[in-house]
Amino acid sequence: MAIVSSTTSIIPMSNQVNNNEKGIEDNDHRGGQESHVQNEDEADDHDHDMVMPGFRFHPTEEELIEFYLRRKVEGKRFNVELITFLDLYRYDPWELPAMAAIGEKEWYFYVPRDRKYRNGDRPNRVTTSGYWKATGADRMIRSETSRPIGLKKTLVFYSGKAPKGTRTSWIMNEYRLPHHETEKYQKAEISLCRVYKRPGVEDHPSVPRSLSTRHHNHNSSTSSRLALRQQQHHSSSSNHSDNNLNNNNNINNLEKLSTEYSGDGSTTTTTTNSNSDVTIALANQNIYRPMPYDTSNNTLIVSTRNHQDDDETAIVDDLQRLVNYQISDGGNINHQYFQIAQQFHHTQQQNANANALQLVAAATTATTLMPQTQAALAMNMIPAGTIPNNALWDMWNPIVPDGNRDHYTNIPFK
């Protein structure tokens, strides 16, 4: 009985142990499923990765030409597309990093060869903001066995328009197959380009393609500023033309001044410009005054000539002040003012010389009038009061003109 009871008691215990083990397995299975689902959720962030984390793309030049470029030209497929097919000459170099499939400091692209001219071999390397310029000749790339496998061309990006662009720090290496191999595959010519930036120089920040419209906005703002400058230049040109018109009017007035001047009398000139009215009245100048000839005739001639020179100098000084005023007021007076002033001064000198010759001729003529001179001396020797005034004027009538008689009424004869 005891044995049986012990046996029966052992059976339920063994069943309990089995059930416990089964429950532990179920919990482990359930926990495994939950952890697997959790791991799948965490792995969703990398489902679209083209390469594994930590992978770096640093191919050699031989690998770029023999594997990537040749397979692309031959039309073969790649398990992983690491190089983007892009016409990079349609974009500026600082826009390219956002379009590359991979790369941190250098970026790779398959580029179709676009010719600048339809019937020529020269490629078109002009972008939106500048152009790529080749430096040096092409270099042959050889394999480990020294077999030529391709060509390499180095280009530098210049911002602006050729040939006055500004050199930047963006550099590109263009790899292509030999020309005879391209014809062999009867494919469009394709090159493989590696773009990178020289370190230590900051030309333009690398921006995504969505922000590339800033360049167009900058061009529009630049165009508007250029149009504004042209408008201001046009207005300043019109103002300058108005000033030139005023200057021409002033020159005409000065010419009138020089033509209206006469030797006998006065000249009154009124010159008007855009700022103020300047009126200069030149006093009446008696260029020639006939004087009675006496023993001091030479002294009278010299004094008259000196007085005449002083008057002419005053006229020239007034004209020079007028010209100087016009120069200071106009700002850009033509040098013809000075030419007119010089002509006027030259004319005055000629008139002065002519008047001096007339005075000398008059003096020479007066020396021949000895009878009249003797009569004048004899009359001066007559005592005062013996000859009436009327008779005295009758004696002087041949010498003194009628027009200047009033000028000599105040001369005492005692």
From Swiss-Prot:
NAC domain segment(s): 51-198
One cellular component term from this protein's GO annotations in UniProt: nucleus
Key words of the record: DNA-binding, Flowering, Nucleus, Repressor, Stress response, Transcription, Transcription regulation
Transcription found in the keyword field: yes
Tissues in which the UniProt entry reports expression: Expressed in aerial organs in early stages of seedling development.
Chief place where the protein resides: nucleus
Record note on domains: The NAC domain includes a DNA binding domain and a dimerization domain.
Record protein name field: NAC domain-containing protein 35
Biased composition (Basic and acidic residues): 22-47
Stated role: Transcription factor that acts as a floral repressor. Controls flowering time by negatively regulating CONSTANS (CO) expression in a GIGANTEA (GI)-independent manner. Regulates the plant cold response by positive regulation of the cold response genes COR15A and KIN1. May coordinate cold response and flowering time.
Disulfide bonds, paired cysteine numbers: none
Compositional bias ranges of the Polar residues kind: 1-21
Annotated region (Disordered), positions in chain: 1-47, 200-251
Inducing factors: Circadian regulation with a peak of expression at dawn under continuous light conditions. Circadian regulation with a peak of expression around dusk and lowest expression around dawn under continuous light conditions (at protein level).
SUPFAM superfamilies: NAC domain
Stored Gene3D superfamilies: NAC domain
InterPro entries linked to this entry: NAC-dom, NAC_dom_sf
Known DNA-binding region: 149-204
Segment forming the signal sequence: none
Domain of life: Eukaryota
